[in-house]
Amino acid sequence: MNDRNLFGINVLMLAPCLGKFGGIETFCLTLIEDLIFRGATVRLLRKKVAGFEEDGSIDRNELEIRSAWTSGQRSRFDSEFVKPRDTIIKKAIQECDILHLHNPMIEGVWYAKKWDKICVMTVYNWRRNGWHPRLWAWRWAVAQADRRWYISEFVWDSWERNRRTGSARLPVVSRMPTGEIPPEKRKGFLFIGRWVPNKGIRILLEAYRKISPNPELWPLTLIGDGPLKADVEKIIRQNKIKGVDLPGFVSEADRHRYTKEAKWMVTPPHTNEDLGLTPLEARSVGVPCIATDDGGVPETAGKHALFCKRGCVKSLANRLQEAVDMCEAEYEQKALATKEGLQDYVRPLDEYAKNYLQLLHRI
């Protein structure tokens, strides 16, 4: 890391927040840890957005990650929740060396330009079409950033038909699980994500019910929480579906353990998913994926995944059955092949430090 020394550099991150630990929160903490280890001082402002409802998961995960840091490293990081147009945001931008926005945040770009601050942006969501003033303001904000990193080709294509200078695809990453488990010791299907409409959790339950595999050999583990929790529990109860495990919200360490122990990661959204982080985590430990042809998911699930039509119970059920019927030799080949191309897709975190230093004219 010595060639990416960030000592003395004050980084401000401004990210939208719904109050629950999700993809943006995961990536922010992963990147922040790398920056802290390189000597930077980092402040994270989590901007409350419509629908904000804190459930404690953000604080729990942040505490888990910070617990492994030294006291000196912890002293160079601070985070807090802020309201839109909070004076804290304005003051923090004035004091920083570089502003890293997570998604187009108009006030962040506005103040950065006003005070001639370097402004970089990670764009997580595909561009919506329409004539609403806010949509045009977002386009303006994205165009003004000194660097733009889109999390997938799917997202990038929606914003830039013609690639701009200063833009790149740089997928967000989490702290990837490590250490593979032998294929013969893995069991069942795993879903990780928010239990919200269009993530496919109800379709997955119905598809699993249709094939009714041996619950001992092929359990279905649903990790997460969300507004559909009552619906999920009702579907399981009314249909007497056997083999479904609901651990709820789990720590990062437990999430990694569940990922390694699963035979297949199932990612079935039908919402134009921007990226799909869990397939990357699964592939990093040789766990292949069953995924929909939705948004950026095919990019992260990899060419060796079993793909199904989005929103289609029958198509997903067919893929689940294919996985159940697959012989061990074929599965082992699939597990080995699923890591193919992963290193070409997931770029190292030091890309961010390198860009920060280039913009600050330190290298």
What are these regions (language model features)?
Residues 25-30, 187, 191-210, 215, ...:
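A conserved mid-protein helix/loop that constitutes part of the nucleotide-sugar donor-binding site
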Residues 305-314, 321-328:
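Conserved acidic donor-binding segment of nucleotide-sugar-dependent glycosyltransferases
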Residues 127-128, 143-180:
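Donor nucleotide-sugar binding/catalytic pocket of nucleotide-sugar-dependent glycosyltransferases
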Residues 266, 288-291:
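Short hydrophobic beta-strand element within catalytic cores of glycosyltransferases
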Residues 233-250:
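Nucleotide-activated donor-binding/catalytic signature segment of Leloir-type glycosyltransferases, i.e.
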Residues 101-107, 123:
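Short His-centered aromatic/hydrophobic patch
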Residues 328-361:
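A charged, aromatic-enriched C-terminal amphipathic alpha-helix characteristic of glycosyltransferases
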Residues 6, 13-21, 27-28, 34-79:
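N-terminal strand-loop element at the rim of the active site
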